[in-house]
Amino acid sequence: MKYQQLENLECGWKWKYLIKKWKDGEAITRHIDTSEADAAIAELRRIEHEPTLVLAWIEKHMSEELENKLKQAIRAKRKRHFNAEQVHTKKKSIDLDYRVWEKLSNRANELGCTLSDAIEYLLSEASRSEKASQKVTSIKEDLSKLLSS
């Protein structure tokens, strides 16, 4: 699915991505000399709010190993950004204990589906089971009334 590219917004994402990688200790520049790398990073930090300069910095200084990773990160961010606009495509998050996640993950693998699909399946099965149980209870009560009269 294609999503509209918003240059100013995406330049901000690229800047944040590069700064995060740098803070995590990764080499984000193509420069071998540390003084050149430090100067390039200082320049990057100065141009946070200059989208066209961020793009020029990427062309001039960014490590080639990061090129695909940056493209993938921006593509994913773009998808999340546009999906968040509509309720039915917006992702929700839940906290699970590890053992619960592990059981759910195993069940999803058995079913050959995603975790979301597995949760949906298990909920519908539980609902079906509950309705069947109520029906059996109702039949037992009716049978009991018939036998006692």
UniProtKB/Swiss-Prot annotation:
Superkingdom, taxonomy of origin: Bacteria
GO biological process: cell division; regulation of DNA-templated transcription
Pfam families: MatP, MatP_C
Gene name for this UniProt entry: matP
Example of a GO MF term: sequence-specific DNA binding
Protein name: Macrodomain Ter protein
Upper lineage: Bacteria, Pseudomonadati, Pseudomonadota, Gammaproteobacteria, Vibrionales
Annotated compartments: Cytoplasm
One Gene Ontology cellular component: cytoplasm
Primary localization: cytoplasm
Record function comment: Required for spatial organization of the terminus region of the chromosome (Ter macrodomain) during the cell cycle. Prevents early segregation of duplicated Ter macrodomains during cell division. Binds specifically to matS, which is a 13 bp signature motif repeated within the Ter macrodomain.
NCBIfam families: PRK05097.1
Similarity annotation: Belongs to the MatP family.
Subunit details: Homodimer.
Keyword annotations: Cell cycle, Cell division, Cytoplasm, DNA-binding
InterPro entries per record: Arc_rbn_hlx_hlx, MatP, MatP_C, MatP_N, MatP_N_sf
